[in-house]
Amino acid sequence: MSNCNAVKNLIVPGTFLSKSGDKSVDATLYKQLVGCLMYLTVTRSDLMFVVCLISRYMADPKEEHMLIAKRVLRYLKGTLDVGVYYKWSKDVNLLGYTDSDYARDIDDRKSTSGYVFFLNGAAICWSSRKQGIVTLSSTEVEYVATTASACHGVWLTGILKELGVLSSKCIDIMCDNSSAIKLSKNPVMH
């Protein structure tokens, strides 16, 4: 892979992965590659979604899964100079973003949700995982994702207050679903 061509995106938009596939690949090699990529997510939050996605197929990896794992390596080759930079500021600002897809996993129709928290513009905490439930609408998916990120935001606020970094102001969590935002402002019958 040292002589490979770099790519600008981690995964081709609109790609759907499935457990069924044409040809199996060496599971040990696949697990080693995914393990190394998981290690990189500690410092490269941009890898989180795709690495979590391909890690679902470690029991019986197919050729399409390995191709995406190799595409991540090609992406890394083109983004060696990318990093997270932390800058000091008297005014500390904690901001969260959350997003999810709706029933994108074609094997069990569960959704993937994720969040990222920024402290003064630099990512300090992030997650991407498959939801444990099957939801019935995109509003419900986004509401579940936002609730999970809010719970983590409460924990993160407590840690930052204990360290003396953050005052007692509220955290803003950004969500891109207007129905989920309205539901969170008026949680009638929820």
Regions found by a protein language model. Name each.
Residues M1-H190:
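Divalent metal-binding acidic/histidine catalytic loops
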